A protein has these predicted regions:
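C-terminal non-catalytic regions of proteins with extracellular/luminal or membrane-system context
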Residues: 1-190
């Protein structure tokens, strides 16, 4: 989807980048659908390398959130690296932004556009589900709704990037953003 041909966004634009997976992108699935990668260029880093300016407010928020989630989700503090959340790049649950009106409004005032990243991961031993997988989670729906509301009020576009392994229900929310991009599992450079 690319309403009013808003894509590509103008290089040098200041972007508010929402979504935990924007800063910890998913390069591949699990089991044989995983890729052995020397490094991963996350969506946030890829946008910077392409000449966009990422809002430091959103970046700081999600970097702290992702670190906290890794601590909560790791099986035990002294587990081997290959068992850690950071090694497997799990999709952490999105934070509930329903009470983050001031944060989102500040970003809408300060930035030229918003990019919201949604992610899914699947593969051997981790089949997908209908609830909170094919369908968005309540937190993801809230994030899209709040970001679209704030940025559209300022006359600014919103792009949703889907870093996913398969189909995701879009009919219930696709009218909200100005553009939807399917990134799929891009390999090591998102």
């Amino acid at each position: 989807k690319n309403d009013k041909n808003i894509l590509p966004l103008k290089r040098g634009s200041k972007i508010a980048l929402f979504g935990a997976s924007a800063y910890k992108s998913i390069a591949g699935g699990t089991g044989s659908s995983n890729v052995n990668k020397e490094y991963i260029v996350d969506i946030s880093d890829g946008l910077v390398q392409a000449g966009y300016n990422i809002s430091p407010l959103a970046a700081a928020y999600y970097e702290k959130y992702n670190k906290a989630q890794e601590l909560l989700l790791d099986p035990q503090p002294d587990c081997p690296e290959w068992q850690r959340v950071s090694y497997h790049r799990v999709v952490v649950p999105e934070p509930d932004l329903s009470g983050a009106t001031v944060f989102i409004n500040r970003e809408a005032e300060a930035c030229e556009a918003a990019v919201v990243v949604l992610a899914r991961k699947s593969g051997e031993t981790s089949d997908r589900r209908v609830d909170d997988d094919f369908n968005l989670t309540a937190a993801e729906k809230t994030m899209i709704e709040r970001v679209c509301e704030a940025f559209h009020r300022e006359g600014k576009p919103v792009v949703v990037v889907m870093n996913v392994c398969g189909t995701v229900e879009t009919a219930s929310w696709s009218a909200l953003p100005d553009a939807i991009v399917m990134a799929w599992f891009p390999g090591q450079e998102c």
